[in-house]
From Swiss-Prot:
This is Cruzipain. The lineage of its organism: Eukaryota, Discoba, Euglenozoa, Kinetoplastea, Metakinetoplastina. Pfam families: DUF3586 (PF12131), Inhibitor_I29 (PF08246), Peptidase_C1 (PF00112). Glycans are attached at residues 169, 292, 377. Belongs to the peptidase C1 family. Residues 345-354 have a biased composition (Low complexity).
Length: 467
């Protein structure tokens, strides 16, 4: 080989080495960063593995999940993804422990739905029930597929508070251990839970203090029926329309809503608004606590049950209006029991035309299924601005066949955005426990001459929010 050829070969080798050294250095740096992140993860979440082989496997899973986080970040420019408490779990492990309700929710999709009627007149631009003190702290379902119980109980906690009672932490363990309609740590349905509470537990929901959660390791202890304190009662539940605008309008007036979602893309979520959520099958139960339509990207606010170390202090935001994560498919809420607070006297002016004989409406609630036994009536005027116990206002009017309630979402003087709903008159409506019937009439003496079944006057309980 000539001298110039040897020189050229040497130069080529040097060039190749010059290229390889930075690449090797970068690779080494990336590996060191990964090792450092993994060590920080283990310390933060108390991970101790049984063997060196197990630790090596978990490190490889950790690496794969960081790559998955980058993929989700690329698809969701308004959200962030990274290391979470689940970063050393395979996707199958994560699914089986934290969002394993696919079979239950698939079965629910086959049943006939009877949603409440919600008319969207003009919901407020933003609602956050956390700011109104209606939501308990984020909880931890642990390695148990009990999301359905946390969703249902979270809803009851909020509804109980908004009916005028103290905010009370209630027991998920009661459902996980005792509700045999559902499957404990293997999944369940919020609607089943509501029905079990009413039909099998006399509507009673125990306090968390008297029946604490004990299934965090994936094992459900046997049901116990004594020694527990009743913290709330429910009388039934309602299903909401599969429409995000109507769900928002209902939530704005009535409070947080239990919903099912597809949570398969949530494992690496750390913050922001998800705009490209996997939306293939329902597999997880959560709680809608608010929304914001005035944001650059309108979003839902969702309370999860994966501790405050996940997401935004235990919450996630997803884009609103495009059925992200299938959020509109299974929405429901408990109907709470108890008397609720007595409404404050209203001094607002009537919105109806003046006249000597004001109109009234009667809500007759009975303990049987035929509106005959144990009936008690509530009588209030129609056409007047009534102050509600949730701090807003409403006007009730009577039509030929229906009673219509218009709730004003941001005003105590019956002005601004409102939501309107209707119920049939003179028809007994069967509930899960008991029944209810509405009547309308008028009398100058202040009693309804055309309703002869009135027993006594009590505060009216609105279908939207108790007045």
């Amino acid at each position: 080989m000539s001298g110039w050829a040897r020189a050229l070969l040497l130069a080529a080798v040097l060039v190749v080495m010059a290229c390889l050294v930075p690449a090797a250095t970068a690779s080494l740096h990336a590996e060191e960063t990964l090792t450092s992140q993994f060590a920080e993860f283990k310390q933060k979440h108390g991970r101790v593995y049984e063997s060196a082989a197990e630790e090596a496997f978990r490190l490889s899973v950790f690496r794969e999940n960081l790559f998955l986080a980058r993929l989700h970040a690329a698809a969701n420019p308004h959200a962030t993804f990274g290391v979470t408490p689940f970063s050393d779990l395979t996707r199958e492990e994560f699914r089986s422990r934290y969002h394993n309700g696919a079979a239950h929710f698939a079965a629910a999709q086959e049943r006939a739905r009877v949603p409440v009627k919600v008319e969207v007149v003009g919901a407020p631009a933003a609602v956050d029930w956390r700011a109104r003190g209606a939501v308990t702290a984020v909880k931890d379902q642990g390695q148990c597929g009990s999301c359905w119980a946390f969703s249902a109980i979270g809803n009851v906690e909020c509804q109980w508070f908004l009916a005028g009672h103290p905010l009370t932490n209630l027991s998920e363990q009661m459902l996980v251990s005792c509700d045999k309609t559902d499957s404990g740590c293997s999944g369940g349905l919020m609607n089943n839970a509501f029905e079990w509470i009413v039909q099998e537990n006399n509507g009673a929901v125990y306090t968390e203090d008297s029946y604490p959660y004990a299934s965090g390791e994936g094992i459900s202890p046997p049901c116990t029926t004594s020694g527990h304190t009743v913290g709330a009662t429910i009388t039934g539940h309602v299903e909401l329309p599969q429409d995000e605008a109507q769900i928002a309008a209902w939530l704005a007036v009535n409070g947080p809503v239990a919903v099912a979602v597809d949570a398969s893309s949530w494992m690496t979520y750390t913050g922001g608004v998800m705009t490209s959520c996997v939306s293939e099958q329902l597999d997880h139960g959560v709680l809608l606590v608010g929304y914001n339509d005035s944001a650059a990207v309108p979003y839902w606010i969702i309370k999860n049950s994966w501790t405050t170390q996940w997401g935004e202090e235990g919450y996630i935001r997803i884009a609103k209006g495009s059925n992200q994560c299938l959020v509109k498919e299974e929405a429901s809420s408990a109907v709470v029991g108890g008397p609720g607070p007595t409404p404050e006297p209203t001094t607002t002016t009537t919105t109806s035309a003046p006249g000597p004989s004001p109109s009234y409406f009667v809500q007759m609630s009975c303990t049987d299924a035929a509106c005959i036994v144990g009936c008690e009536n509530v009588t209030l005027p129609t056409g007047q601005c009534l102050l509600t116990t949730s701090g807003v206002s409403a006007i009730v009017t009577c039509g030929a066949e229906t009673l219509t309630e218009e709730v004003f979402l941001t005003s105590t003087h019956c002005s601004g955005p409102s939501v309107r709903s209707s119920v049939p008159l003179n028809k007994c409506n069967r509930l899960l426990r008991g029944s209810v019937e509405f009547f309308c009439g008028s009398s100058s003496s202040g009693r309804l001459a055309d309703v002869d079944r009135q027993r006594r006057h009590q505060p009216y309980h609105s279908r939207h929010r108790r007045l």
